[in-house]
């Protein structure tokens, strides 16, 4: 992109202009005028580029070009205009009749800039020296592309911008950072177990990470005597040694606290629970059925354990006592009243132990205290 070259620059002469070339160019312009600089070298018979011919004519061969060295007054004016306009050499040259912009630019770069920026030379103009700036030239030159103002550098501007951006980011981070808040990482939940280590944590509303990401480096508390072990009620804390950095084991203490809090929440809820109410209702119905049964303790035990009403020992004693009682009732004895009275009064009956055992067995029932304890357990909510 851009402007097309003025010529092919093939076979053209380069370097310094000779006196013969200056004479040919001056004669052609005096006869035909400046015209088109692209066609001028070919028409004039010069082996030069059109741009080279234009610069040679404007900067050296023109009749109104002021020759000679730049005076001290002109230096002062150049310095003041450069401080105001910057590197806008065409606009500066318009205030010097007979001086070209190229000449002023070369003089600034070769003499004035070195003296000002290297040696810090101060130019003091005469009291009667005044600089008059033509405002019409300033307005007309605004349409052109001007140079940079003195003291301005793209590198310095970018460096200042980077510095300001970095400082603003630092200030924002300081404002948003809540500070290194120390928080107990291995403390017990109750007040009876004091914290044994402190860890630096981020915001409390941050999402959960993996177990490895939740591990934090903690510092031992020198005031605690058992700080080397690092074990607390909530979870173990392992460390390298008593003085080195400690690491909190990747155990999820939050789940335990959440489970306990869930149980507390269930116990403190006023609304009934569907499953729990169903179990309690079924158990209460079974207890009511047991109390509604019309049975003695033997029947109650048989119904409870699914066995006979009497145990095996009681059955054997009753079977042994029945034949003896039958024999005593069926044998005829004429002296039965006297013998019975005498036997009852004086002689021990040989069947007395069996009868006593049978009577004791008949009156033997399950332990009342055991049944009361069983009833209490049955009515309780242990099951």
Swiss-Prot record:
SMART domains (UniProt xref): SANT (SM00717)
PROSITE patterns: HTH_MYB, MYB_LIKE
Region (Disordered): 136-250
Keyword match Transmembrane helix: no
GO MF terms held by the record: DNA-binding transcription factor activity; sequence-specific DNA binding
Organism domain of life: Eukaryota
One example of a Gene Ontology biological process annotation: flavonoid biosynthetic process
PANTHER family (UniProt xref): MYB-RELATED PROTEIN P, TRANSCRIPTION FACTOR MYB8-RELATED-RELATED
Purpose of the protein: Transcription factor involved in regulating the biosynthetic pathway of flavan-4-ol-derived red phlobaphene and red-brown 3-deoxyanthocyanidin (3-DA) pigments. Regulates transcription of chalcone synthase, chalcone isomerase, dihydroflavonol reductase and flavonoid 3'-hydroxylase genes required for the phlobaphene and 3-DA biosynthesis. Transcription of these genes is activated in mesocotyls in response to ingress of non-pathogenic fungus C.heterostrophus.
Protein name listed in UniProt: Transcription factor Y1
Organism: Sorghum bicolor
Lineage start: Eukaryota, Viridiplantae, Streptophyta, Embryophyta, Tracheophyta
């Amino acid at each position: 992109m851009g402007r097309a070259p003025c010529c092919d620059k093939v076979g053209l002469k380069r370097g310094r202009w000779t006196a013969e070339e200056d004479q040919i160019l001056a004669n052609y312009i005096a006869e035909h005028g400046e015209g088109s600089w692209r066609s001028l070298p070919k028409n004039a018979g010069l082996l030069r580029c059109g741009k080279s011919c234009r610069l040679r004519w404007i900067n050296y061969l023109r009749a109104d070009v002021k020759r000679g060295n730049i005076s001290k007054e002109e230096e002062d004016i150049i310095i003041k205009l450069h401080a105001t306009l910057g590197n806008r050499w065409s606009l500066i040259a318009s205030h010097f009749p007979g001086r070209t912009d190229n000449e002023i630019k070369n003089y600034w770069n070769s003499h004035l800039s070195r003296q000002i920026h290297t040696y810090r030379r101060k130019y003091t103009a005469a009291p009667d020296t005044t600089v008059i700036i033509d405002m019409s030239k300033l307005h007309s030159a605004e349409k052109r592309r001007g140079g940079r103002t003195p003291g301005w550098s793209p590198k310095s501007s970018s460096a200042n911008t980077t510095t300001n951006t970095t400082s603003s980011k630092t200030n924002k981070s300081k404002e948003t950072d809540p500070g290194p808040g120390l928080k107990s990482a291995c403390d017990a939940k109750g007040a009876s177990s004091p914290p044994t280590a402190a860890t630096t944590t981020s915001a409390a509303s941050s999402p959960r990470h993996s177990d490895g990401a939740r591990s934090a480096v903690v510092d031992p508390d020198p005031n605690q005597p058992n700080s080397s072990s690092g074990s607390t009620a909530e979870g173990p804390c392992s460390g390298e040694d008593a003085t080195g950095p400690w690491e909190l084991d990747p155990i999820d203490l939050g789940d335990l606290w959440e489970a306990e809090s869930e149980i507390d929440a269930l116990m403190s809820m006023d609304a009934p629970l569907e499953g729990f109410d169903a179990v309690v209702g079924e158990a209460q119905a079974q207890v009511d059925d047991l109390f509604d049964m019309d049975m003695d303790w033997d029947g109650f035990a048989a119904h409870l354990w699914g066995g006979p009403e009497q145990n095996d020992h009681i059955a054997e004693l009753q079977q042994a006592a029945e034949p003896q009682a039958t024999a005593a009732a069926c044998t005829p004895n004429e002296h039965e009243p006297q013998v019975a009275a005498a036997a009852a009064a004086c002689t021990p009956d040989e069947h007395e132990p069996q009868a006593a055992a049978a009577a004791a067995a008949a009156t033997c029932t399950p332990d009342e205290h055991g049944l009361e304890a069983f009833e209490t357990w049955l009515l309780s909510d242990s099951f």
